[in-house]
């Protein structure tokens, strides 16, 4: 089976930066090391960190004194960071710089009197963190979902960094018809836009697509959605253990894409399985 791997498959720059920080801290810390929430949305990578002795907590109140707290790639709620600093805990900030951008925009524009609208998933750690930096009310709009009435003349629209561009534009356009002043700041990260464009191109060239990454990874789910719109034979898996030979009946070429939090070794595991797949009717 021929396998075409997307150029952008695997760790993005921001995730690799955070992973390297965690490994460095784990190697040199004199006390316990924990991440504030899963460091990235990939169960296989989190398991590797656990093997290195790095734990995961949901709140600073769960850790003891002398613990080093690493902030996850998606950032953290400001109040939790304040609690950690108030206790004198060592905090290593692993927040992706692209995530810090919407945090700063929300803080600045809310201070200027704008009602901040965020296009994304209200339950995602990144969005919870961004909201905590706003100095005024925020409204989160789910992509494709209804847009509530917002009692404000000035509205600022930002996006979850992994948002699909068309979803962001749709919300901006709808709000522009309702409000006198709408300020839109595209906070979708460059890697996300490149990765999504790469996935679209790949899906047009192959007989099936496999997207690899955590089922809890927003950017991976979006890649699968994008590919499926073009190539209906698209599957989202976490590892090669989920693959089934019958999915690829009649396929000559399979495309392989992966989310920004998918480790290289997981991508290679899936690629190896696909390359070794025997197609009926071939020697």
Swiss-Prot record:
One of its GO terms (biological process) is isopentenyl diphosphate biosynthetic process, methylerythritol 4-phosphate pathway. Binds 1 [4Fe-4S] cluster per subunit. The active site is at 126 (proton donor). (2E)-4-hydroxy-3-methylbut-2-enyl diphosphate binds at residues 41, 74, 124, 161, 217, 219, 261. Pathway: Isoprenoid biosynthesis; dimethylallyl diphosphate biosynthesis; dimethylallyl diphosphate from (2E)-4-hydroxy-3-methylbutenyl diphosphate: step 1/1; Isoprenoid biosynthesis; isopentenyl diphosphate biosynthesis via DXP pathway; isopentenyl diphosphate from 1-deoxy-D-xylulose 5-phosphate: step 6/6. InterPro entries: LytB/IspH. The keyword Iron applies. Disulfide bonds: none annotated. [4Fe-4S] cluster binds at residues 12, 96, 189. NCBIfam families: ispH_lytB. Catalyzes the conversion of 1-hydroxy-2-methyl-2-(E)-butenyl 4-diphosphate (HMBPP) into a mixture of isopentenyl diphosphate (IPP) and dimethylallyl diphosphate (DMAPP). Acts in the terminal step of the DOXP/MEP pathway for isoprenoid precursor biosynthesis. This is 4-hydroxy-3-methylbut-2-enyl diphosphate reductase. It comes from Anaeromyxobacter sp. (strain Fw109-5).
